[in-house]
UniProtKB/Swiss-Prot annotation:
Chain sites annotated for binding L-aspartate: T119, N123, D124
Binding sites annotated in the UniProt record for L-citrulline: Y87, S92, N123, R127, S176, S185, E261, Y273
Name of the protein: Argininosuccinate synthase
EC number(s) stated in the UniProt entry for this protein: 6.3.4.5
GO CC list: cytoplasm
Residues the entry annotates as binding ATP: A8, Y9, S10, G11, G12, L13, D14, T15, S16, G117
Amino acid sequence: MKEKVVLAYSGGLDTSIIIPWLKENYEDIDVIAVCGNVGQEDKMEDVYEKALQSGASKAYVDDISEEFVTETIFKAVKAEAKYEGKYLLGTSLARPIIAKKLVEVAHKEGAKYICHGCTGKGNDQVRFEATIAALDPTIKVIAPWRIWDIKSREDAIDYAEKHNIKVTATKAKIYSVDANLWHVSTEGGDIEHLENEHKKDVYKQCVDPEDACDVAEYVEVYFEKGVPKKVNGEELSPVALIHKLNELGCKHGIGVIDIVENRLVGMKSRGIYETPGGTILYEAHNILESATLDKDTLHFKQMVSYKYGELIYNGLWYCKLRESIDAFMEQTQDNVTGTVKVKLYKGNIKPAGIFTENALYDEGISSFGNSELYDHKDAEGFINLFTLPLKIRAMKAGK
């Protein structure tokens, strides 16, 4: 009886050549290709056909975009999770959902192996394998990029040509692109040279901010307990909401970043990330929290958010700490309900209004006018006590 290998399949260069490679290097195996649709723009029927044409014995193409949004993206929005203060974790958030689907199919098919096309230098190999280990440690992983003779994307293209596999990558334009509903990342090629300004042709969604619409646009986002529900007054499904914000953000050049990041595996890498809708959501959520969370909760949440983002980036979605932080984040969102109005213009997002019944901001107290709850004279006593440690230190130092 043939062994079964479940392959994380995208239809791209790497995973397309893995199918014939597996059949050449492992005897009596069936390759079962699994593509989890997390909102990438590829035509799923084409991906299905390509998997079979490349030699897969069976292919699954499942739409998991709703789960992607509700189970990972919206949790990240509540936490305002970022990696190294900039990256909105587009690839990192998708991997645990895809890996979970791989494990489910492996169980269904009775497969002992899962194979992925992640390179030996990247973070994704860790993300996939950490999820697989957490969900079923008995499953064995095959990682071709760590063992085969193919050493570069140029080599991979040559292999594809020899096996009559059609791919979109060329040696002239060697970008590596990862796309889903939340973002598009572009790496490789001339981007790898730090002295190069990235070219406009790297953009897959957004217009360059310089070329964006000359007319500003206002957008309203309604949140209920930290979860986005409406855009411009229209209630939308989670997936449709992200699509709508992407559409609005793209034409204004929102959410384009060019960063050098520290990979989990120890090296630095440079990438161009486009997260138009996500950037609008993060900014709107941040604005709403600034008005509805007390200082101590907000400041502590910001500290914890950094760790939360790091855990996601490192592939530890299914660790106990991430789940525990989620419980805290959920508590912080009780009063994060209301509408935020923002202004989009040439890559920028500006606050344009906060509408909530839960604001801790009180105009009467915050203004320079009189207030029954606050007497200006009270500040003197507060300052005396607040600065007491500084005074004592200065007195001791003066001896």
